[in-house]
UniProtKB/Swiss-Prot annotation:
ATP-dependent specificity component of the Clp protease. It directs the protease to specific substrates. Can perform chaperone functions in the absence of ClpP. PANTHER family: ATP-DEPENDENT CLP PROTEASE ATP-BINDING SUBUNIT CLPX-LIKE, MITOCHONDRIAL (PTHR48102:SF7), ATP-DEPENDENT CLP PROTEASE ATP-BINDING SUBUNIT CLPX-LIKE, MITOCHONDRIAL-RELATED (PTHR48102). Belongs to the ClpX chaperone family. Zn(2+) binds at C15, C18, C37, C40. HAMAP family: ClpX. GO terms for cellular component: HslUV protease complex. The lineage of its organism: Bacteria, Pseudomonadati, Pseudomonadota, Gammaproteobacteria, Enterobacterales. GO terms for biological process: cell division; proteolysis involved in protein catabolic process. This is ATP-dependent Clp protease ATP-binding subunit ClpX. Component of the ClpX-ClpP complex. Forms a hexameric ring that, in the presence of ATP, binds to fourteen ClpP subunits assembled into a disk-like structure with a central cavity, resembling the structure of eukaryotic proteasomes. One of its GO terms (molecular function) is unfolded protein binding. It comes from Buchnera aphidicola subsp. Acyrthosiphon pisum (strain APS) (Acyrthosiphon pisum symbiotic bacterium).
Amino acid sequence: MTDKSKDNSKSLLYCSFCGKNQKEVQKLIAGPKVYICDECIRLCNDIITEETIKQNNITDTENKINYLPKPHEIKKHLDNYVIGQNYTKKVLSVAVYNHYKRLYNFNKKTDSVELGKSNILLIGPTGSGKTLLAQTLAKLLDVPFTITDATTLTEAGYVGEDVENVIQKLLQKCKYNVKKAELGIVYIDEIDKIARKSDNPSITRDVSGEGVQQALLKLIEGTLASIPPQGGRKHPQQEFLQVNTSNILFICAGAFSELSKIVSKRLDAGTEIGFKANIKEKKQKKSEDFLLKQVEPEDLIKFGLIPEFIGRLPIITILNKLTEDALVNILCKPKNALIKQYQTLFELENVKLEFNAESIQLIAKKAMNKNTGARGLRSIIEGILLNIMYELPSMVNIEKILINESVVNSNSLPKIIYGKNKSKKASGE
């Protein structure tokens, strides 16, 4: 029995890498005086793939920086998706271009002047296009992008999200590829909601206001952050990822609804020289857009942002409140215009959807009255089209649906045009 087992072991072939015999593996591939099993082939393939991905990421990063669109090209792209806000688009185009050119300089690691990071603060009313501008930029540059609501953030140790979760969301967007995340854009919305609650220091700790600003300082400026992949509070034992935030572009945005009053007070105080000086000028009410364009860091400090936080956001740009004409253009002109979206949705049912000029003007007027900017347009159109979208899948032989001003005004049924197979009928005529 012993001799037979020795003979069997001699006849078996073994993998030259892991030492397993042919019975312990699925496949054993032979070469000149050497063998390799399927398990070792898979392992080698994984190693090569991992190295290739790393190399591709480095090359991809260099290519993105080297083939960066010029400011004119960036603005032109923004014009296709965002109506108005020309000055803000120029500011963003230059800021983003300079930011990624700075990365090229950083990667070269020359002994030249070190370029600082220029994060951005967007100030503008609800629905003026702040979020859309940032999203459009990220798509153009093909970099990871994440949106965080500042109101959900709290200081570490308190109920709410830690500020590190901002970077964790960015990592999720690029499947935890740290190198890609370090080139991303973080958009922090509602930044005005974390303003300091009072000018005077309080005994009660302001964990969702000044505390969050303090916690964000290092992250925005640039630091080596330890990020838990699955969130630190629920999984405290996990291995942390090291992410350098020095090259991440932070765009903070908010409505800053009371800021114009602070600016107005400062401007009025500056005109009070002499007895009854400039009384006529003071009585003239200045528009909110005009006042916000005069904003200074001292106004933001009075609003409740701490000086150190403002210092990390050197580029401040103001978005104008959208006019009725601008809302009309938003409905029709951009590549992803709302009316085009709903027309595409109806085309899936082989039905044409048309709005006449008067109905579009009325929709814009309704949004203006609600004071919700472009954000309110979708809810208005949803309300107008709800009944027809409910009935349409069950209807047959529909060719076209026409929306006129009476549909928008009184929510009556739209005009329905049937195909040639049936006699023409119309609802709401």
